[in-house]
From Swiss-Prot:
Its EC number is 2.7.11.1. SMART domains: S_TKc (SM00220). It holds the Pfam family Pkinase. Keywords: ATP-binding, Kinase, Nucleotide-binding, Serine/threonine-protein kinase, Transferase. The lineage of its organism: Eukaryota, Metazoa, Chordata, Craniata, Vertebrata. ATP binds at L53, G54, S55, G56, G57, F58, G59, S60, V61, K74. Signal peptide: none annotated. This is Serine/threonine-protein kinase mos. It catalyses: L-seryl-[protein] + ATP = O-phospho-L-seryl-[protein] + ADP + H(+); L-threonyl-[protein] + ATP = O-phospho-L-threonyl-[protein] + ADP + H(+). Residues 47-194 form the Protein kinase domain. The active site is at D187 (proton acceptor). The gene is MOS. The keyword Protein biosynthesis does not apply.
Length: 194
């Protein structure tokens, strides 16, 4: 019988701390990205968090500057109630890093180690898509944060039929691409569409 030794993007196959890996003695566990994602490790000296954009069940998203460019930084928190789900969410999001499409946010860098905060499962730096979400466009709501220097540039009028068709086309194009890669977006809502 043969063993499939291809790289795995999930850390779930690794032994727990102190356990043996394929019968080999104690090996120090180093949290790192799989080889196919090594290109995207974070240069921490070049990252400057500006302010919180929002937070959800698995973490928080910040506006930041990375190598002089405006980016979004997602810090995936360790979930004490559902650690497995938070790990799977982090690694599933990193699997998208290899993809490139105009309607899918590009991942710039990522790390499973966070120097400033040990309660973080990992950090993902993504291209910054702006503050204005489809939710803001539909409902004409104001700022994502109370930070007036980072105002939204949304048209607070009614969403026209032409605009709705453009948004729908872009959403469907992005989803069709993800589905062609066997990836399903599990949190699709107007607040997550930029």
């Amino acid at each position: 019988s043969s063993v499939n030794a291809r790289p795995c993007s999930s850390p779930l196959v690794c032994p727990a701390k102190g356990e043996n890996f394929f019968g080999v003695g104690n090996v120090a566990r180093i949290r790192r990205l799989p080889p196919h994602l090594a290109w995207c490790s974070i240069d921490w000296d070049q990252l400057c968090l500006l302010h919180l954009l929002g937070s959800g069940g698995f973490g928080s998203v910040y506006k930041a500057i990375y190598h002089g460019a405006t980016v979004a930084v997602k810090k995936v928190k360790r979930c004490s109630k559902n650690h497995l789900a938070s790990r799977q969410s982090f690694w599933a999001e990193l699997n998208v890093a290899r993809l490139g499409h105009n309607n899918v946010v590009r991942i710039v860098a990522a790390s499973t180690c966070t120097p400033a905060s040990q309660d973080s499962l990992g950090t993902i730096i993504m291209e910054y898509a702006g503050n204005c979400t489809l939710h803001h466009v539909i409902y004409g709501t104001g700022y994502l944060t109370g930070n007036n220097s980072d105002s939204l540039k949304c048209d607070h009028g009614f969403l026209s039929t032409a605009q709705a068709v453009i948004y729908s086309h872009d959403i469907v194009a992005g989803l069709m691409f993800l589905h062609s890669q066997l990836i399903v977006h599990l949190d699709l809502k107007p607040a997550n569409i930029f």
